[in-house]
Amino acid sequence: MSKAKVTNARRKRSVRLKLRRSGGGRPRLSVFRSSKHIYAQVIDDLKGETLASASSLEKSMRDGGKTGADIDAAKAVGKLLAERAAEKGVKEVVFDRGSYLYHGRVKALADAARESGLSF
């Protein structure tokens, strides 16, 4: 494994451990970003289960024929995730950006989730 991958993996693990400790029992909104799509899920770490999830791969997102690798797709995923989390009764979460910078698609997803009712 290259030095960059090792450093990235350590950072991810460190961030997640800090979030679990300081989360106060709140679910975690985890973001994964690939070059073509973006995925997000709300995870209850105490029970070890996913409460809600959304991605740019879903059929409702792909109908427009757009790519999942842009800011508009990230906003749509954030809005959809917040709606699904609200259906499950989740209002407050801890944002887990992993090793990604809070910029671009990650920021757009977070802002859309906030506007749709999630607080973090």
From Swiss-Prot:
Highest taxon listed in the record's lineage: Bacteria
Annotated GO CC locations: cytosolic large ribosomal subunit
UniProt keyword Ribonucleoprotein, yes or no: yes
One of the GO biological process terms: translation
Gene3D superfamilies: 3.30.420.100
Listed Basic residues bias regions: 8-23
Chain segments carrying region Disordered: 1-26
CDD domains registered for this protein in UniProt: Ribosomal_L18_L5e (cd00432)
HAMAP family reported for this sequence: Ribosomal_uL18_B
Assembly and interaction partners: Part of the 50S ribosomal subunit; part of the 5S rRNA/L5/L18/L25 subcomplex. Contacts the 5S and 23S rRNAs.
UniProt record similarity statement: Belongs to the universal ribosomal protein uL18 family.
Known function: This is one of the proteins that bind and probably mediate the attachment of the 5S RNA into the large ribosomal subunit, where it forms part of the central protuberance.
Stated name of the protein: Large ribosomal subunit protein uL18
Species this protein is from: Bradyrhizobium diazoefficiens (strain JCM 10833 / BCRC 13528 / IAM 13628 / NBRC 14792 / USDA 110)
Gene name of this polypeptide: rplR
